[in-house]
Amino acid sequence: MSIAPLLRKVFLIDLIKGLSITFKYQAPKDCQTEQYPQERPVITDRFRGQPMMKLGENGETLCIGCNLCALACPENLIAMKSDRDPVTKKKVMVTYVYDVSRCMFCGLCEEACPTQSLKLGTGYEMALYSREGMVLDRKVLEHRTAPEPYEK
């Protein structure tokens, strides 16, 4: 019997070699984890997040009540009601309800809007305690802003 295999078993040389390779990968040189919420990820312009409605220079909504966004939505999440203004004879949006709870953020409603009033913004923090909070009306959509920075 040879002494070399016996020494390998006694001093566990193969085990030590394997563990050295394992521990080399356990302590990476650069950390890939984002320290959220202290460090926010960089959001690109093409990101589709929280829906919002743009307002014009005069502070009124740009929506003309055409209902194209509701027709384009594959999940039927948008409910809109519009009436004709008796003075100007133009369609005016009366109610607008957007249910974000089932939205898949496909952007079809944004593409269908002829006035570009509906926009899927860069907000991604939409966690709530109830489903009722996910149903957004016109006032909430018009007054959406950029996400607030984290403070400890």
UniProtKB/Swiss-Prot annotation:
It is found in: Cell inner membrane. It comes from Koribacter versatilis (strain Ellin345). GO terms for cellular component: plasma membrane. InterPro entries: 4Fe4S_Fe-S-bd, 4Fe4S_Fe_S_CS, NADH_quinone_OxRdtase_chainI. Its main location: membrane. Belongs to the complex I 23 kDa subunit family. [4Fe-4S] cluster 1 binds at C63, C66, C69, C113. Pfam families: Fer4_7. Binds 2 [4Fe-4S] clusters per subunit. Residues 53-83, 94-123 form the 4Fe-4S ferredoxin-type domain. Its EC number is 7.1.1.-. Keywords: 4Fe-4S, Cell inner membrane, Cell membrane, Iron, Iron-sulfur, Membrane, Metal-binding, NAD, Quinone, Repeat, Translocase, Ubiquinone. NDH-1 shuttles electrons from NADH, via FMN and iron-sulfur (Fe-S) centers, to quinones in the respiratory chain. The immediate electron acceptor for the enzyme in this species is believed to be ubiquinone. Couples the redox reaction to proton translocation (for every two electrons transferred, four hydrogen ions are translocated across the cytoplasmic membrane), and thus conserves the redox energy in a proton gradient. Its cofactor is [4Fe-4S] cluster. This is NADH-quinone oxidoreductase subunit I 1. NDH-1 is composed of 14 different subunits. Subunits NuoA, H, J, K, L, M, N constitute the membrane sector of the complex. It is a peripheral membrane protein. GO terms for molecular function: 4 iron, 4 sulfur cluster binding; iron ion binding; NADH:ubiquinone reductase (non-electrogenic) activity; quinone binding. It catalyses: a quinone + NADH + 5 H(+)(in) = a quinol + NAD(+) + 4 H(+)(out).
